[in-house]
């Protein structure tokens, strides 16, 4: 391989890209570190869904005129508060679990990192299973603690809003997930970490903020999925026909968005420098 164009003045890079993860690493199944990471993903996704869905249910109850009277219109945390709940929980949970599992908490993030060879197929599958189970358990806790409100206020399920086509909903999920996964790649880039020593500590902040911003943009359209586990967990517990009929949007969209983000970061942003370096070395 040729030298990269992003070398420092002395010709030596001040960062090192980690080697790609093996596609299938059977030996990984014998390591406790894998199962510890899977447990961390399960618990983190459970907590994420519990807090966020409880926030959604609470907001809808506080703004219900039949329950809160004339003050309902001014009650609750509002869409801004819901977006903060999602973004804030991602910030907290990524910070807590990044050193154990990488802090994915989202099958779309796991899928994007798998395409970029950051995690093996075995780890990716186990993570996604753990995330989905954690999401179901988290929403089930909300229903258990707020059974009188849960079904009445929609169970926190993602559904395409009235007036929007399925294509619009799909596009919203693709773009929203692209923003999130692109932020994940940028915040965890080893090149960035080498330049700014504080970046590893602050990495959860832009990731959480990306989730917050995407929610502001897409809550009116789809309720904001950008996380298939979040959408599946709510659909399983709520078990409503509308939530199930729209469920494919919240899997296809995020996986497409994650794939585009992975390809953009790995091929356009990072590999272009290597290609330019190879061209120069062969000139």
Swiss-Prot record:
The keyword Transport applies. It is found in: Cell membrane. A motif (NPA 2) lies at residues 227-229. It is a multi-pass membrane protein. It comes from the Eukaryota. Expressed in roots. GO terms for cellular component: plasma membrane. Coiled coil: none annotated. Induction: Circadian-regulation. Expression is higher during the light phase than during the dark phase. Down-regulated by chilling. GO terms for molecular function: water channel activity. Belongs to the MIP/aquaporin (TC 1.A.8) family. PIP (TC 1.A.8.11) subfamily. Water channel required to facilitate the transport of water across cell membrane. May play a role in root water uptake. This is Aquaporin PIP2-5. It comes from Oryza sativa subsp. japonica (Rice).
């Amino acid at each position: 391989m040729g030298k990269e164009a992003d070398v420092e003045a002395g010709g030596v890079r001040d960062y090192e890209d980690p080697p790609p993860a093996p596609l299938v690493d059977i030996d990984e199944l014998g390591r406790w570190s894998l199962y510890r990471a899977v447990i961390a993903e399960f618990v983190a996704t459970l907590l994420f869904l519990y807090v966020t869905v409880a926030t959604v249910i609470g907001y809808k109850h506080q703004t219900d005129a039949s329950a809160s009277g004339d003050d309902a219109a001014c009650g609750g945390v509002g869409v801004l508060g819901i977006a903060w709940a999602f973004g804030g929980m991602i910030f907290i949970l990524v910070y807590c679990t990044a050193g154990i599992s990488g802090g994915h908490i989202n099958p779309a993030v796991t899928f994007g990192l798998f395409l970029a060879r950051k995690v093996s197929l075995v780890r990716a599958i186990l993570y996604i299973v753990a995330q989905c189970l954690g999401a179901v358990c988290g929403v089930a806790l909300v229903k258990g603690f707020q059974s009188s409100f849960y079904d009445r206020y929609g169970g926190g399920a993602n559904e395409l809003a009235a007036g929007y086509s399925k294509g619009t909903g799909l596009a919203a999920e693709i773009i929203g997930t692209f923003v999130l996964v692109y932020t994940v790649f940028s915040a965890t880039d080893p090149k960035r970490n080498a330049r700014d020593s504080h970046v590893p500590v602050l990495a959860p902040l832009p990731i959480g903020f990306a989730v917050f911003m995407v929610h502001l943009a897409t809550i009116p359209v789809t309720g904001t999925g950008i996380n298939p586990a979040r959408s599946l967990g709510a659909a399983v517990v709520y078990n409503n026909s509308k939530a199930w009929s729209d469920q494919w949007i919240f899997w296809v969209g995020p996986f497409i968005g994650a794939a585009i983000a992975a390809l953009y970061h790995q091929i356009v942003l990072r590999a272009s420098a290597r290609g330019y370096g190879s061209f120069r070395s062969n000139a």
